[in-house]
Amino acid sequence: MKTFAQFSLYVFALLFGLSAWGQNRNLDNFRSPDKDGINVFEAPKDSMLTFDGVKVRVGGSSTLQFQGLNHENSGAVELIEIGDNFNLATANLDLDVALAKGVRMHLRTYLSSRHHPEPYVKGGYFQIDNLDFISPGFMEEAMKHLTIKVGHMENNYGDAHFRRSDNSQTMYNPFVGNLIMDGFTTEVGAELYYRGNTGFFTMFGLSNGKLNQAVSSPGETGASILAKLGYDKQISDDFRFRLTGSMYSTGNAARVYLYTADRTGSRYYLVMEDTDARASSQFRSGRYDPGFRNEITAFMINPFFKYRGLEFFGTIEAVKGKADAETSKRSATQIAGELIYRFGNNENFYIGTRYNTVSNEEASGDDITIDRFQLGAGAFLTKNILTKIEYVNQQYDGFDAASIFNEGAFKGVMLEAVISF
């Protein structure tokens, strides 16, 4: 409690001390953390830069859920008893700093999360859209199209991670839970973007393949390669279309974390967990890791369109990989589709549904399937405050008779409120 009080005092002092900078909070080439950031994917690129000195933007978010879920299985493994109540409130602290013309820093700290009730740093990066800090006019024409990102940061694999809940930053997610196979990781690396004038863009990146950074055990983990090719165009005032294909691959890793890197935890607390489970330690409830521990190649295709208030976002994911103990590679597939309708003044209300299915050949030889149906609705009280309600129903099929997931299912209602600024 004393440590938390000291940290809270520090944050208050920081916010108060920087309040003068907070009057104009707009930054160049920046995804807004409020309603304006919805359906923004990569940070926008604008060659008209407004830098007039170092500017510090202090932001953050806080989210609270009420959970009313129940679960069941065959009884081979006893499930923990769960009831209806509130989950731990989560919070983020964001620092975004304009350091020079076209140069910006981002840093996110998780103040409170399911897995880590204590504060810890998620990661951060430098984003470079202009090279005048080297020499005025240096590569000026090229930098109208190029963006460079370097840091210990969230990899840009696929488009689904732009819509996922990141601890308390849940403004961009129209639902409460993320995908069953939640493709997300933070690694030290660099990404180079090229954006043309016709809507086409591409990205190539390299990372060190490590979630937990260390200089010990050299040679156990090789580099990870990332790539993305896409088209994103506002065809008319009413219609926007986007289509991307992405790849993430590493052929040698001490541990692949692509589907287990989110250490903040899932939104469905303690579902399908045994009687010894604790919310902070068994924090991936409701998610699925295909178990490609040491070698993986993943491809994701994401179509998106928005026509007036109607929007669709899809995910088609094909993954191959294995653990060192396996002699041959296995395959996993994930498909998801979201249909959202936004309505009312400034589209302040929405209703939507998502279907998500995962199939995988497990190391045991079992062919398993997990299906999830979500039905949700939301209302923006202001551009910084969103309330959501969701019905979720998840079914497990094909699991071994001794598995806790054998004939497993969970379903019920979730309520969530988020403040983000």
Annotate the PLM regions.
Residues 47-70, 81-214, 218-251, 335-337, ...:
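Outer membrane beta-barrel
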Residues 1-33:
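Cleavable N-terminal export/targeting peptides
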Residues 74:
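Short, conserved catalytic-motif segment at the N-terminal edge
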Residues 24-34, 71, 79-80, 125-130, ...:
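Outer-membrane beta-barrel pore domains
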Residues 23-42, 46-48, 157-160, 226, ...:
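Surface-exposed, low-hydrophobicity segments enriched in Gly/Pro/acidic/Ser residues
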Residues 36-37, 60-62, 92, 264-266:
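Glycine-centered small-residue hotspots that permit tight backbone geometry or close packing
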